[in-house]
Every structure is written in structure tokens, then in C-alpha cells.
Amino acid sequence: MKIRIALITALILMVLAVACGTAIGPPPMSPLTPIASNGSWPSYHRDNAHTGNDPNLPTVVSVSTSWTSASLDGQVYASPVVFGGVVYTATLNDTVYALNQADGSVLWSRHLGTPQSSGWRCGNVTPTGILGTPVIDTAAKRIYAVAEIHGTTPRYHLFGLDLATGTTLLDQVLAPSGFDWTIEQERGALALANGYVYVPFGGRAGDCFNGSHPYYGFVVGVPIDGVSAQITFRTADGGEGIWGAGGVVVDDSSHDVLFATGNAIPCAGTTMSDAVIRVSPTLTSPSTFEPQDWQANWCEPDSDLGSASLVLISPTLAFTAGKHGGGFLVDPTHLGGVDGQLYPSPAGYRQADVCSGASSDATFGGFAYAAPFVYLECEGKGLVALSVNTSTPSFSPCDPTCAAPDWRAGGGTTFGPPIVAAGAVWVASDGGGLSAFKAGDGTLIYQSAGFGIDRFVTPAEAGCRVIVPSLEVIRTFVMHFAPGISCPG
């Protein structure tokens, strides 16, 4: 693989007036000198549809261990994002790092503030600095990340940093009406579209209220111009958090915004519990899908449909599943309300299992799609591939037998969400390291030595490298191809 060194000159600091206050700081270091553009993975699962699929690579033949970064200043839950030969990663200590894609050396780091480490009504992540996956604006050459910052009243901030220097170009406080930081958490991945960064919020682990005040699901749209007013969507009822690690999905054809919610509290009489919700680019005009049995089997037992983010297969077809273990194909342009799915058939509804019959804590995070399969992790049941018919929307359920053309691999392992690249499905597990399975039939292609990961961690891939957050370091693995075939780009 040829690596070309390109000098990036220093960028002039730009003063932006923003509604909630902008902090412009000095460059933390001299401008970086990255390797030439070598693949990109600018958002959670690569694209706005969250396919998690890089279709541009030849078939992998073998894999070797590459660089491991120096220890970072905190744990990494967020997926790395990659652009222009640089791997960007963010920690629970509110620091963003830029690492050279070729060797893992630190090109710059930017500490955004002191993270909040106490004061929540409930929760299971401490501190909560940067938890959700950032997103890169490849045109404006910025990375956006949301950090919880300690203070007399702790606040969530959206930061926009210059890709080359880490200079802060945008800093906006996120405090929509009715928002209570003690019971709200930003875990889901950010999305960039329509001139906004979309930021999802849900409850903290434990589903706590602040007295009688509930948490809600929020999506905040922050204008990237730094001047226009923020926009907000809030779910109709208490609970209904937008907390899955995959976060917000955007349909690039309609520009509509989609996300999935957890259970309402209480369940009865609510309208957005365990739902897929579509809103306009300005977060208005919501339409919904809810399972026919949303109250009895999803809401009441806390079996959130929104434990994972949906994946767009096409503008008119999306797959979603959640903790109760049922999967659905829906039409994002016509979600259809309760029992409005395309598959399984609304007539005489019967759940289509996706995790070998599991009906509790079945799947989390997000999915990947590479025709004809949707790939998902199943808690304690390994990796599952579901064969999808896109012409007559349906898929082969993975019931306890998980019969062909579906496949299941990885035994009883609990993986993080999968991605697809070079004809392989890549997943990581805590203590087990990185695994790669043949995309067509689940044959094991590669197994690394064991290492630890945090909850819901998903890899990234760019330049024929698979990039995995491993607690306080980033680990990378290089793909090799048949003789005479090199990495594209």
C-alpha cells in the first residue's frame, strides 16, 4: 500500500457568532501532516443509512495485527471515525484525538473540559464525557462531538473542531426546554445532514425520573452555521428514550431523519413507545411505526425496540429489531402506525425472531447490511445473518434453528455491533478481541488475540484497516488480499 505524505498548512482561526456561546481556542499543536486520503469512515457505520458496509474492497485473504495506539486519557465507547488518513477518536474524559492512520501516532489532541462524574439520578457510565460517536463534515473539514462538561450546572456541549489542528470552531450548549441533565444522557451516534448536526438523548441506565419529572427522548438539531437557532424534537410521553448506540439515521433521498425509541413510562395510552419515528429535516411532522404487541411484549417488560438503531436498506425499506428479539421490515416513507410493518405480515401478526428465539435483551447497538444479508449481534448467541428479500419485503427469521439461508456464528459470544468489509463481517467482544467471519456463510476467517472492549463497541474500517476501540487504546488490523491485489486508493 503506497502512502503519500501531504503537508497540510495551518488554518486561520475563524470567529463564529453562535446563539449559545462559542469558544475559540488556540491550536493545541502545530498543524498535522496526515497520510494521503486512504479510505473514509466519517460516521457511525460509515454512512447516513448506517449500512456499516464498505463495498469497495477485494475479498480479504488474511489479516495481520497492526499498530496499537499509546494509552489515551480515558475509556473509548464511541466508534472511531476516519477521514484523510487520520483516525479520530474520543474519550469519556472529554478529549478528542487525531491519530495517524499509518502508525497510530498522535497528531493532535484536544481536551474539551472536565467531564461530569457524579450527580446523576442513575446511570452506569462514569465519567460521561464523550459517549456518543462523533461525525465528520468532510466538506467543511470539521469533526463534531458532544461532551458533558462539569460545572455548577453540568451541560452538554456540541463542539466543532478543525480536522487539521483540533482548534475549536463551534461550541454550543444543548439545553432544550424540559431537559434535565441528571436523568438524560447522550449515548447515540450523531448525524450530519441538512445543515444540522442531529444529537439524540435518552434516559440513563435505570430509567430514573427526577422526582415526578420524567426523562424524554430528544433529538436536538444544531445548525452548523453557528448562528441559526437550534431545533428540537421531543417524544410525546415520559420515557421513550432515543438511547441506542447507533443513534440517528438520515435518508439521503428524502433528507428525513429517523430513529427508534425505548419504552414509555407508564406504557398505557402512549403514542411513541418502542417506535420507529420519522421526522422532517427540521424535526417536525412525525410519523411512527410500533409493533402490534408494543405494550404487552415491548413496553411493559422494558424490552426496548430502540435498543438498536435501524438500518436503511433503501429509501423505501428499513430493518429494525430490539430487546424483545423480533425484527421488522418497514417502509420509511409510510411507517403505518401500530402494526404498520411490511414484514412480518400485519394480518395475523406473529413475531419474526432474529436471535435464535431470544425474547429478552436480544440485540443492541446497530446493524449492518450487505445484500442479501442484515447482520446483527445477539446477546449470548453470537452473530446472526438474516437473508432479506427486497423485492417482496421479507426475511428468513432466525428462530431456534436459524436455518439456511440464514447463518449464526460465534457460539455463545456476546459481540458488539457488526460491520462488513472485504467480504467479511467484523465484530469485537470483550475479552475475545476481533473476529472476522465470511459474509456469505459465517465461516471464521480471522481471530485476534483477546483484548477488552467497552459496551456496544463497534469497529470502523478505512484503508483496508479495521479499527477497534479497546478500553483506553485503539487497535488496528490490516487486511491482505490475493497476490497482485493491493488496497484500493
Q: Model features per residue range: what roles?
A:
Residues 1-8:
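Bacterial N-terminal signal peptides that target proteins for export
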Residues 16-19:
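C-terminal motif of bacterial Sec signal peptides marking the signal peptidase cleavage site
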Residues 21-23:
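Bacterial signal peptide processing site
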Residues 26, 34-37, 53-74, 82-88, ...:
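Extracytoplasmic/lumenal domain signature
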Residues 38-39, 47-51:
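Solvent-exposed adhesion/ligand-recognition segments of exported proteins
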Residues 42-46, 110:
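Short, solvent-exposed beta-strand-terminating loops
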